[in-house]
């Protein structure tokens, strides 16, 4: 069966904030110059926003540039931040609010909004379509198409209708060739094609390894008397103080809803640590429980976050394409924000690509646009935030951040680099303390399976496993023997289980549970797991996240 082929001027992989901003900006520039430029966005989720997960406190700077009249246009920014608190939790019972002067200036949220990023992306998609962008949800980009001149010239979407053995079923449809003069990869953190392109074109040369965290989010409905619309709460300390770096958040949206979550850096050392269970017990702290008691959990999700910052940012341009947004790692960890930076990277990419298409150039000169932008300046000023915490721990690293941002106002002359990749950070299980987590009570804390249910997940059961092992032996002979197989604990969805086989223990992969967080691809100590996209349209369907 022959593959269909479609051709465009610009192809964008991923309908998140970076990809949609790029699509809108290309079409805006084409209209300004009275040119016809075709733009296509392909999205692996069942709809735009289905795979979008973020806190999210949103800085409007990029949106102000892209759509100055966004308020009149009905952008879903309904809750302005009106209170900003930071809690230090000293243990499971005690904590206190930090004074404003003790919090890095970058964490202040005056003028920002609490939003659903999924809903913002849905709104941006409608604006893109109004501008003439073609958007195709439910199609996963499987691999980049690279020609004989080593130029990226599009992507091949995944085949549909293969059974678990890779054989064609009655409904088989081959993937489609989507070809373009320029392809922008906006897959989010640890994008599977982006990862391949970084390696193929050596884009991370002289850069530090990218660093990641896993971010959890639950959406709750709470009683009106506990709701304080516009309140932003960030937390540090317990439960992560001694085992990992990271932090917590609780945001009061409209409609008596709160978003609560925990961010756990993936450079933690103890293989017995379970980020999911840390999140569940976090909600029992009295300073957090006060907001959630008598409430109802209505949604759950988790996603990897690329947080290495400026020192980890790869070269983003190559022949025929660009990496943008979290696919490259444009998040500003000093602000705990990545949406406005992802959007700006997409807009800069659009300007570079528009120039290249107009001039019939092979390479879009993104780097020049980037270095002349406020995005470059912002990421440069925040360059030592994540690496400082990774190198020196939460207290010394946090003190360095205070010095750089509150005293030196982002003008520090030194660089702090972290050369140690996250997957190499685990120590042996025999040298680690086991962690006994409390059983979930079904009121504030929950188990993995009931949580995954609230992600509205769907995968076709009879399809090839999208979680690929380079070696079937490593999970038992190395990971289980040395690290008590940490995949059982770092996965937030119960995908990986150790079961007793006929002769020895085996790793069972429950691929249908996967919520596409990419943590296994990042944290596996042997780098034995590769996350690949399942059939298009599969995965979580986040409604308001």
Q: For the regions a protein language model found, what residue spans apply to each?
A:
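N-terminal FAD cofactor-binding segment of flavoenzymes
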Residues: 44-93
């Amino acid at each position: 069966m022959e593959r269909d082929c479609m051709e465009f001027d610009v192809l964008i992989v991923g309908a998140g904030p970076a990809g949609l901003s790029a699509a809108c900006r290309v079409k805006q520039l084409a209209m300004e110059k009275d040119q016809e430029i075709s733009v296509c966005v392909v999205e692996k989720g069942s709809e735009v926003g289905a795979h979008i997960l973020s806190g999210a406190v949103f800085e409007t700077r990029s949106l102000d540039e892209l759509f100055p009249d966004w308020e009149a246009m009905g952008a879903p920014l309904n809750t302005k931040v009106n209170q900003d608190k930071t809690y230090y939790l000293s243990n499971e019972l005690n904590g206190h609010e930090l004074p404003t002067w003790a919090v890095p200036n970058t964490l202040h949220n005056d003028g920002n909004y609490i939003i659903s990023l999924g809903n913002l992306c849905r709104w941006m998609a409608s604006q893109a379509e109004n501008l003439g962008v073609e958007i195709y949800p439910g199609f996963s980009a499987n691999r980049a198409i690279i020609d004989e001149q080593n130029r990226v010239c599009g992507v091949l979407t995944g085949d549909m209708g293969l059974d678990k053995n890779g054989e064609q079923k009655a409904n088989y449809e081959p993937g489609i060739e989507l070809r373009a003069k320029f392809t922008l990869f906006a897959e989010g953190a640890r994008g599977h094609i982006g990862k391949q392109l970084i390696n193929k074109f050596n884009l991370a040369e002289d850069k530090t390894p990218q660093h990641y965290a896993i971010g959890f989010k639950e959406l709750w409905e709470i009683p009106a008397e506990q709701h304080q619309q516009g309140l932003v709460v960030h937390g540090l300390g317990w439960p992560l103080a001694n085992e990992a770096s990271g932090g917590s958040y609780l945001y009061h949206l409209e409609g008596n809803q709160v978003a609560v979550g925990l961010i756990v850096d993936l450079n933690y050392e103890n293989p017995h640590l379970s980020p999911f269970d840390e999140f569940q017990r976090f909600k029992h702290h009295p300073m957090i429980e006060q907001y959630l008691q008598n409430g109802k959990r209505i949604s759950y999700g988790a996603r990897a976050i690329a947080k290495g910052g400026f020192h980890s940012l790869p070269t983003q341009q190559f022949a025929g394409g660009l990496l943008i947004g979290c696919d490259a790692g444009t998040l500003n960890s000093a602000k705990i924000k990545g949406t406005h930076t992802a959007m700006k990277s997409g807009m800069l990419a659009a300007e570079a690509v528009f120039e290249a298409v107009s001039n019939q150039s092979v390479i879009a000169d993104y780097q020049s646009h980037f270095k002349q932008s406020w995005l470059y300046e912002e990421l440069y000023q925040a360059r030592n935030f994540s690496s400082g915490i990774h190198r020196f721990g939460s207290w010394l690293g946090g003190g360095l951040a205070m010095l750089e941002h509150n005293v030196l106002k982002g003008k520090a002359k030194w660089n702090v680099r972290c050369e140690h990749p996250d997957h190499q950070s685990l120590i042996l299980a025999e040298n680690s303390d086991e962690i006994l987590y409390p059983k979930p009570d079904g009121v504030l804390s929950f188990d993995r399976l009931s949580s995954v249910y609230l992600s509205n997940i769907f995968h076709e059961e009879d399809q090839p496993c999208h979680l690929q092992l380079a070696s079937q032996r490593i999970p038992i002979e190395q990971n289980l023997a040395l690290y008590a197989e940490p995949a059982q604990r770092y996965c937030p969805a119960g995908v990986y289980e150790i079961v007793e086989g006929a002769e020895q223990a085996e790793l069972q992969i429950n691929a249908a549970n996967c919520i596409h967080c990419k943590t296994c691809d990042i944290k596996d100590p042997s780098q034995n797991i590769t996350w690949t996209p399942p059939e298009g349209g599969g995965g979580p369907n986040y409604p308001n996240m």
